[in-house]
């Protein structure tokens, strides 16, 4: 299972920008073919770190699908005309296959289901939410990704999926409250918390080089460091801290 390793995988194929936009529903997007000063083309992915970690992880998998042009592959192999709506469905399915592989998921689902099933092999809505939250923890993906995967692999009906996602007779706020309780009761502290991360890979090093070169004003560099929470003094102080380790010749 990839879990949050997908964030590092994404880093290999593009420059990832993390920044919190609290009033923005967009979880992320990508921009391709941006030239640098030498004309080399680069791809950038923005991830909204005001979203929860599990949403950031699924967003990373989604954007990886765009970078790998999975939609174009499907279009060519299946001889389809792929519009925007279908394109997003293809990429979402790719992200689900990447983050929640079928064989592993089905075994995990079986184990979790058997823990809470009734003697007649049925399950209550409350216990189904327990199964979903435990699977969220195993795969580190959002609730909706698990629910949709359950439906895709014929574990639950469309009606049950709609019910859990707040499109049935039970209000979504009641479902969300119960899910939150299960998360807290199990100590799944990573969930439902935004990271508010401000970071661009290798950006701190580039700012240091720009600072030393004198090509960018000190004020502008300071402003950028503040924007991305890069504190030069703290970084330098940490690098200069002696480590509590023994040398190779210690007896």
Regions from the language model: what does each represent?
Residues 1-251:
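Active-site hotspot residues in diverse enzymes, especially metal/ion-binding acidic/histidine motifs
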């Amino acid at each position: 299972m990839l879990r949050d390793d997908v964030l590092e995988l994404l880093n290999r194929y593009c420059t990832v920008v993390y920044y919190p936009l609290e009033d923005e529903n967009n979880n992320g997007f990508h921009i391709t073919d941006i030239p640098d000063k030498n004309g080399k083309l680069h791809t950038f992915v923005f991830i909204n770190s005001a979203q929860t970690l599990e949403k950031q992880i699924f967003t990373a998998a989604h954007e990886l699908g765009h970078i790998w042009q999975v939609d174009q592959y499907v279009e060519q192999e299946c001889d389809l005309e792929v519009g925007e709506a279908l394109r997003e469905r293809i990429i979402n399915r790719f992200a689900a296959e990447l983050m929640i592989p079928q064989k592993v998921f089905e075994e995990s689902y079986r184990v979790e289901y058997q823990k809470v099933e009734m003697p007649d092999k049925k399950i209550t809505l409350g216990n189904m939410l327990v199964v979903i939250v435990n699977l969220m923890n195993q795969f580190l993906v959002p609730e909706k990704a698990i629910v949709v995967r359950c439906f895709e692999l014929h574990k639950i009906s469309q009606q049950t999926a709609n019910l859990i996602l707040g499109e049935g007779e039970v209000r979504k706020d009641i479902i969300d409250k119960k899910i939150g309780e299960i998360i807290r009761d199990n100590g799944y502290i990573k969930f439902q918390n935004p990271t508010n991360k401000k970071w661009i890979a290798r950006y701190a090093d580039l700012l240091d080089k720009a600072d030393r070169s004198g090509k960018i004003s000190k004020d502008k560099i300071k402003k950028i460091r503040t924007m991305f929470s890069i504190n030069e003094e703290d970084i330098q102080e940490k690098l200069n801290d002696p480590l509590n380790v023994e040398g190779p010749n210690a007896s």
